[in-house]
């Protein structure tokens, strides 16, 4: 019974507690927002930490000791809520799928039993304990949140405090600045001065920077302009130099062709004033060398004479021959500056009275005319000269360009030109051979007249061949003369080019005429063969002479093909090639073989053997050294003053003068040497100097030096001259500055015996017919008989060449960038 009595109050109490807890839960729902979130925390971890047997008794004892009912109610309410949560938690754990451990189950049962069957004191004590723990947790959470809030506040306040401290510092600074009004004014003044100084400094820096920019830009612009100007000047200079070189080259080439084809030597051609009578006379003389009967010309007319230098005159005149101005049948040849020397050598005065002329001239008159022409040569080109004074003791007035020779009126023949051309550059005044006139219309004419008369006397039908042909109109001659009359000839290139074009037209007409007469060379060749073969001493010489026929006519046994050593000079490139091969400017002309009449120009050939090198390798001239640059002009001056002076004497004078010159005087010539060497190196980068071997001549089986050979040839020529010209005044052939003789016919002096045809020492023409010269080289050739170079040493050019080759004068192997065809040009 006791057990039942003991359990009944517990049950009643439990029912009362359940009702109380229900009431508390309803209140909690009403006061839901007032409860702290921490009160809803589960209590099972706290209750697990304490022994279950002690929880309820302590809770009951705590409730009994608490006198405040409100606190008890609040604690009970919390306890009930916690118990409800605990029961729900246990129910959740019981309904979970995970199996429960046996101890946990027993433990939970004990807790439930203790909770269900504990006394109220125990329950109150446990509630108080729970409240304490909750308070402790709340405090901990509050402290944690306060710490977090304090850290955030510190972060926020740190900025505020910094600003406050900065304000404080500035206020302190302002407090320091604050002072007496004088100090403030002084400080303000200092600040204003500093500000103005800084502003001025900034402006100065900006201005200096701008100036530097402008200066740099201006300097760059100036440099660019200077570079552009220098480049333009260099280009212009290069173009001008190239044009000058091309023009000089063309003029030289045309001059050579014109001189050769037009039979015109480079004379000092007088330019007559614009007088129709004079022009008509010149045109008539150009075509026939005779005045028509209706035109009169007074030789005593005084007119200013204007001289053209020989190099330009030959290119401009393009084949004009000396004006043979005649009145009726009176000849008017042009005087030669070396007439005195020629007359001395022949022991005769140039006295036309031998032919019945009305005028006689002694040596004094010739000297005066010679001096007058020398003086005229000193005048600059294009300058006007007054008329030359007449000799005081002359019977009649004399033209300043020549001596008037008269012939017998009863003579049925015409007077042949008795002159040598005015060549101030001829380096030697050797006696010229007599050459009669031969008509191109009678190529097979007998060379030896039956009568013992003068070789200048020929039948009436023989006339001097006109260089431009009789069919050339009178208008072209007048045009050329009028173009030559221009005083600005040398300042106007158009005039020169016009004259050159006229010369080309003449050349084309000459070619057409020669093509219409193809039998001319055959006739000349037959006459030459008759003459040469009859004089050949040995069979070897006869065979060699016979072999010259196909070569001279341009015909070959191999279907017109020429050998490797034959060059066609009608093509400009071949002419240039031969110019480069021949070692010196003087030698270029000596290899030209131009037929004077009958044959076509296409038959002009060069026959030459290579000199110590392969035949295909052209000869490259050495660049001129400083001495040669200086001597070129000095030699020209000496020749103008002394045309008869020999080249060896001129070279000795130049050598002594060069040695006496100071280095300062030589400096510009060394600079020119460096420039020429640079040009030569650019043009021939692989050039290597190969000196030419010394030549010796084999005559009659003996080796002779050049001096001995020249003496032997001189004596033999003198013998032949005396044999053929006994009692006769020799006729002078027309010679050019190129060293090639172009007479109108074959002379007696060139019909020498066979050595002339077989001379291996001749470097120029050695043919009886000078219009068809044969070039032979001395290298690799032998000779059986004596040799006589007919025209070899007649011309002064050959003397110079011999001196160049054998007396160590280096001029012959030197070249300049603007070489003239002549060895030494007068202008």
From Swiss-Prot:
There is a cross-link at residues 404, 417 (Glycyl lysine isopeptide (Lys-Gly) (interchain with G-Cter in SUMO)). Residues 620-688 bind DNA. GO terms for cellular component: cytoplasm; nucleus; transcription regulator complex. Residues 184-262 form a coiled coil. Residues 795-808 have a biased composition (Acidic residues). Residues 25-34, 341-357 have a biased composition (Basic and acidic residues). Disulfide bonds: none annotated. Residues 1-10, 421-431, 439-461 have a biased composition (Polar residues). Changing residue 765 to L: Increased localization to the nucleus. Decreased transcription cis-regulatory region binding. No effect on DNA-binding transcription factor activity. Transcription factor that plays a key role in several developmental processes, including neurogenesis, chondrocytes differentiation and cartilage formation. Specifically binds the 5'-AACAAT-3' DNA motif present in enhancers and super-enhancers and promotes expression of genes important for chondrogenesis. Required for overt chondrogenesis when condensed prechondrocytes differentiate into early stage chondrocytes: SOX5 and SOX6 cooperatively bind with SOX9 on active enhancers and super-enhancers associated with cartilage-specific genes, and thereby potentiate SOX9's ability to transactivate. This is Transcription factor SOX-6. It comes from Mus musculus (Mouse).
């Amino acid at each position: 019974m006791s057990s039942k009595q003991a359990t009944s109050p517990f049950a009643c109490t439990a029912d009362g507690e359940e009702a109380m807890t229900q009431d508390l839960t309803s209140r909690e729902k009403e006061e839901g927002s007032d409860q702290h979130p921490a009160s809803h925390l589960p209590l099972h971890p706290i209750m697990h930490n304490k022994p279950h047997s002690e929880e309820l008794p302590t809770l009951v004892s705590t409730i009994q000791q608490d006198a405040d009912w409100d606190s008890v109610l609040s604690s009970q309410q919390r306890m009930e809520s916690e118990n409800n949560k605990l029961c729900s938690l246990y129910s959740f754990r019981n309904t979970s799928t995970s199996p429960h451990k046996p101890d946990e189950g027993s433990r939970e049962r004990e807790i439930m039993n203790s909770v269900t069957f504990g006394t109220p004191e125990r329950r109150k004590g446990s509630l108080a304990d729970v409240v304490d723990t909750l308070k402790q947790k709340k405090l901990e959470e509050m402290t944690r949140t306060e710490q977090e809030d304090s850290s955030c506040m510190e972060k926020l306040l740190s900025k505020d405090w910094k600003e406050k401290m900065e304000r404080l510092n500035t206020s302190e600074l302002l407090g320091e600045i604050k002072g007496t009004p004088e100090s403030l004014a002084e400080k303000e003044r200092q600040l204003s001065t500093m500000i103005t100084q800084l502003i001025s400094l900034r402006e100065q820096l900006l201005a200096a920077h701008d100036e530097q920019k402008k200066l740099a830009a201006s300097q760059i612009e100036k440099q660019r302009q200077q570079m552009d100007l220098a480049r333009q000047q260099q280009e212009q200079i290069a173009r001008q130099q190239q044009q000058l070189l091309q023009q000089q080259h063309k003029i030289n080439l045309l001059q050579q062709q014109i001189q050769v084809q037009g039979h015109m030597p480079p004379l000092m051609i007088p330019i007559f004033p614009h007088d129709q009578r004079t022009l008509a006379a010149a045109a008539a003389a150009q075509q026939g060398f005779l005045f028509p009967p209706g035109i009169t010309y007074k030789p005593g007319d005084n007119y200013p004479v204007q001289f053209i230098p020989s190099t330009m005159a030959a290119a401009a005149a393009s084949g004009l021959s000396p004006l043979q101005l005649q009145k009726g049948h009176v000849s008017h040849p042009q005087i030669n500056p070396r007439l005195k020397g020629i007359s001395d050598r022949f022991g005769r005065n140039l006295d036309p009275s031998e032919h019945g002329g009305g005028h006689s001239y002694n040596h004094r008159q010739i000297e005066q005319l010679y001096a007058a022409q020398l003086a005229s040569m000193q005048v600059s080109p294009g300058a006007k000269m007054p008329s030359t004074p007449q000799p005081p003791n002359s019977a009649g007035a004399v033209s300043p360009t020549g001596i008037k020779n008269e012939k017998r009126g009863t003579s049925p023949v015409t007077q042949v030109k008795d002159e040598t051309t005015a060549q101030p550059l001829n380096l030697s005044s050797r006696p010229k051979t007599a050459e009669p006139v031969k008509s191109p219309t009678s190529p097979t004419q007998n060379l030896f007249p039956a009568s013992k008369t003068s070789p200048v006397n020929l039948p009436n039908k023989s006339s001097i061949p006109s260089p431009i042909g009789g069919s050339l109109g009178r208008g072209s001659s007048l045009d050329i003369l009028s173009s030559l009359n221009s005083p600005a000839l040398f300042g106007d290139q158009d005039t020169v080019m016009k004259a050159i074009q006229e010369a080309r037209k003449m050349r084309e007409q000459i070619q057409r005429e020669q093509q219409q007469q193809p039998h001319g060379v055959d006739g000349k060749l037959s006459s030459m063969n008759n003459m040469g073969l009859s004089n050949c001493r040995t069979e070897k010489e006869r065979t060699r002479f016979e072999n010259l026929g196909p070569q001279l006519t341009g015909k070959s046994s191999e279907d017109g093909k020429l050998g490797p050593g034959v060059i066609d000079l009608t093509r400009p490139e071949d002419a240039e090639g031969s110019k480069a091969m021949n070692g010196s400017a003087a030698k270029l002309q000596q290899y030209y073989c131009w037929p004077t009449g009958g044959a076509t120009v296409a038959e002009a050939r060069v026959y030459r053997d290579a000199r110590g090198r392969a035949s295909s390798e052209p000869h490259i001239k050495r660049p001129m050294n400083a001495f040669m640059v200086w001597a070129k002009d000095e030699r020209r001056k000496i020749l103008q003053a002394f045309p008869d002076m020999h080249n060896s004497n001129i070279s000795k004078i130049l050598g002594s003068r060069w040695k006496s010159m100071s280095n300062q005087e030589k400096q510009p010539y060394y600079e020119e040497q460096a420039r020429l060497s640079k040009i030569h190196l650019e043009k021939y980068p692989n050039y290597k100097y190969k000196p030419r071997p010394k030549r010796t001549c084999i005559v009659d089986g003996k080796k002779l030096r050049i001096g001995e050979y020249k003496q032997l040839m001189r004596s033999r020529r003198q013998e032949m001259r005396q044999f053929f010209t006994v009692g006769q005044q020799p006729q002078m052939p027309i010679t050019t500055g190129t060293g090639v003789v172009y007479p109108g016919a074959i002379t007696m002096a060139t019909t020498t015996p066979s050595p002339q045809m077989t001379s291996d020492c001749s470097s120029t023409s050695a043919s009886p017919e000078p219009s068809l010269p044969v070039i032979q080289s001395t290298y690799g050739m032998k000779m059986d008989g004596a040799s006589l170079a007919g025209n070899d040493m007649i011309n002064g050019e050959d003397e110079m060449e011999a001196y160049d080759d054998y007396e160590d004068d280096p001029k012959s192997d030197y070249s300049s960038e603007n070489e003239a065809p002549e060895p030494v040009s007068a202008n």
